[in-house]
């Protein structure tokens, strides 16, 4: 069988099939798995890229029934039962699990693709880090840039990613860069972080009390929160809001949403809003009982609406699809059991010693307790023992010293040439 994608859903499916009497080929364009929940810490210099990525082959060193193929699946030939690879050639399959994930959705806002900084894959985080640090270096060389918005950072999207980026960026500026540029020509105190959210409240999935806590905490960190408005246009040095207001800013971080991978449209099957693929209760494709779609790419309806594109859904749906494949192969159990999502709660960190967590049945945590729970959960799910140790050491050092050791500009410079 073939599994497309080495994200949370694809890895969960592949690991579930360990020991099953099937030969598995896992295909991904990268030879590493990225722990996306911590990408914002790479972008804000808290962690290094290698801390949040782990080699795929290393994950499956002991799984004898799995082979990895570094490539991209661009189409599926249903009649011949094979996937077409971007690098040329095909892979045959008896059964297929598609877990190709999602990509950034700019909703057609003019200028976002050209001038905005997404934060969805590892190179995005490195480019954004280069750019943030580069803006301060540029302002040191030319202080007048501050008057033109050179140190104004607009974050679009008030969900967990946007809130986490805004809080971490405000702390980076206030506690680290303020110290780094002491005595330089940069007036770091004039740097500004603005968080823009289209709805009236931050963190829409959370309760009103958690939303208020997030807003209050961000304000205390110096983040300017703008709710009830959206971005209408983005230029290289300006952001125009829906009401016509113009913000002079050289940086726009786009955390406003995602859409299904382009592979969804290439499958030749019905899709829903956001390009997600419609699946049956058992996650199979209608008309293609040999194929499953899981994770962010699947429109999974649990009766109360479509499930969100989060890691929990991806992992649980990936494991479920793999279990059904195993049942079919061995001829035991129900191979068409409906998928049932078990909500384990939602968390978002707002910065040092501040987070919100809502866990079933109705448990709500805020502040330091939620922050510690957030840290522990992410360490548990992070791939690789070395990565867990490295991240823990970095977090401990940052907590004790307010230092962020990954303040490095890599590659071509500050990242402007690589924007979008």
Predicted feature locations:
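FAD-site-proximal beta/loop scaffold in flavoenzymes
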Residues: 114-144, 237-240, 246-317, 323
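C-terminal, flexible cofactor-proximal segment of oxidoreductases
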Residues: 322-420
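A Rossmann-like FAD-binding core segment of flavoenzymes
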Residues: 64-75, 170-281, 285-287, 333
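Short hydrophobic core segments
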Residues: 2-4, 91-103, 231, 239, ...
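FAD-binding core/adjacent interface of flavoenzyme oxidoreductases
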Residues: 66-154, 253
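Short glycine-rich anion-binding loops that position phosphate/pyrophosphate groups of nucleotides
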Residues: 9, 101-104, 166, 258-260
């Amino acid at each position: 069988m073939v599994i497309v994608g080495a994200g949370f859903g694809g890895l969960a499916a592949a690991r579930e099939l360990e020991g099953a009497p099937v030969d598995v080929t896992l295909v991904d364009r990268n030879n590493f798995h990225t722990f996306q929940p911590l990408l914002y810490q790479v972008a804000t210099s808290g962690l290094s890229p290698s801390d949040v990525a782990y080699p795929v082959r290393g994950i499956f060193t002991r799984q004898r029934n799995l082979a990895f193929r570094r490539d991209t699946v661009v189409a599926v030939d249903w009649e011949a039962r094979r996937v077409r690879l971007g690098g040329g050639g095909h892979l045959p399959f008896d059964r297929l699990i598609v877990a190709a994930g999602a990509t950034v959705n700019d909703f057609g806002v003019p200028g976002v693709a050209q001038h905005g900084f997404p934060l969805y894959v590892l190179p995005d985080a490195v480019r954004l880090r280069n750019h943030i640090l580069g803006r301060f270096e540029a302002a040191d060389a030319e202080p007048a840039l501050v008057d033109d918005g050179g140190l104004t950072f607009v974050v679009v999207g008030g969900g967990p990613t946007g809130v986490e980026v805004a809080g971490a960026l405000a702390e980076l500026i206030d506690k680290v860069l303020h110290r780094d540029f002491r005595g330089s020509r940069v007036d770091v105190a004039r740097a500004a972080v603005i968080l823009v959210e289209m709805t009236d409240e931050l963190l829409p999935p959370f309760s009103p009390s958690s939303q208020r806590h997030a807003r209050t905490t961000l304000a205390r960190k110096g983040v300017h929160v703008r709710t009830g408005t959206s971005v209408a246009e983005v230029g290289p040095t300006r952001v125009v809001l829906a009401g016509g207001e113009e913000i002079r800013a050289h940086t726009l971080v786009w955390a406003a949403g995602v859409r299904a991978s382009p592979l969804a449209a290439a499958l030749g099957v019905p899709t829903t809003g956001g390009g997600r693929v419609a699946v049956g209760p058992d996650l199979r494709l209608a008309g293609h009982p040999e194929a499953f779609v899981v994770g962010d790419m699947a429109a999974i309806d649990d009766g109360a609406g479509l499930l969100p594109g989060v890691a929990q859904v991806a992992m649980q749906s990936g494991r479920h699809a793999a279990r059904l494949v195993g049942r079919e192969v061995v001829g035991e159990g129900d191979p068409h059991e409906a998928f049932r999502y078990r909500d384990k709660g939602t968390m978002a960190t707002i910065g040092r010693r501040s987070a919100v967590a809502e866990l079933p049945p109705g448990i709500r945590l805020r502040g330091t307790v939620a922050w510690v729970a957030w840290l522990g959960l992410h360490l548990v799910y992070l791939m690789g023992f070395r990565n867990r140790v490295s991240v823990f050491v970095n977090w401990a050092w940052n907590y004790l010293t307010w230092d962020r050791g990954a303040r490095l500009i890599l590659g071509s410079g500050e990242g402007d040439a690589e924007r979008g």
